[in-house]
C-alpha cells in the first residue's frame, strides 16, 4: 500500500470524539475573549451578565472535559501517520495532554475562586452551583491571577494545536485534520 493510500485509509475519530472535541473547542474559543472582556469591563449589568455567562460555560466545560477525558482514555485516538517524526509525535501528545489538564484545572480554579470570593456560580440562570470553598478573599484574589495565566496558557496551546492541524492539512496534506472533521 502506498503512503498516499495508507493516509487515505487512516481511521478517523469516532462521532462521539468529534462531537466532544468541537463542542469543547467552540466553548473554549468563546471563553478566551469573554474572559478578557469581563476582566476589562467596569461594573453594570453587562459585566454581571458576562460573568454569569462565563461561569455557566465554565461549569459546562468542566463537565464536558471530564466526559471527554473518560472517553479518550477508553477510546484512544487513531494513530498518527507513520512518517511523522518522533519530535512532532511528542509535541502532539504533549499539546493534547497539556490542553486536557489545563481545561480540567481552569474551571476548577474559577469555581474555587468564585466560591472563596464569595459569589454565586449560576448555571445559565437555572440554578446556582453550591459553593465548594469557604469565604477567603485573599485566596480568591490569588486564584484570579492563576486563572488569568491558565487562560493565557490555554489560548497559546490552543493556537499551537490549531496551527499544527492547519500545517497537516495545507502543508503535509495528510488526513490528520480531516479525521477530526469527518472521521
Predicted regions: what they are:
Residues 1-183:
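Membrane-embedded alpha-helical bundles that constitute the cytochrome b-like, heme-associated redox core
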Amino acid at each position: 500500500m502506498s503512503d498516499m493510500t495508507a493516509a487515505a485509509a487512516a481511521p478517523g475519530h469516532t462521532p462521539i470524539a468529534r462531537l466532544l472535541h468541537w463542542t469543547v473547542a467552540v466553548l473554549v474559543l468563546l471563553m478566551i475573549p469573554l474572559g478578557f472582556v469581563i476582566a476589562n469591563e467596569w461594573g453594570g449589568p453587562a459585566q454581571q451578565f458576562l460573568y454569569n455567562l462565563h461561569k455557566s460555560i465554565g461549569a459546562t466545560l468542566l463537565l464536558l472535559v471530564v466526559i471527554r477525558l473518560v472517553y479518550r482514555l477508553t477510546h484512544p485516538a487513531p494513530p498518527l501517520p507513520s512518517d511523522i517524526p518522533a519530535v512532532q509525535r511528542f509535541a502532539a501528545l504533549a499539546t493534547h495532554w497539556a490542553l486536557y489538564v489545563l481545561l480540567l484545572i481552569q474551571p476548577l480554579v474559577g469555581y474555587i475562586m468564585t466560591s472563596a470570593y464569595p459569589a454565586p456560580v449560576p448555571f445559565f440562570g437555572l440554578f446556582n452551583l453550591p459553593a465548594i470553598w469557604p469565604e477567603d478573599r485573599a485566596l480568591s484574589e490569588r486564584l484570579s491571577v492563576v486563572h488569568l495565566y491558565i487562560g493565557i496558557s490555554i489560548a497559546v496551546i490552543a493556537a499551537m494545536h490549531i496551527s499544527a492541524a492547519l500545517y497537516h492539512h495545507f502543508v503535509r496534506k495528510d488526513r490528520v485534520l480531516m479525521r477530526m472533521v469527518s472521521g
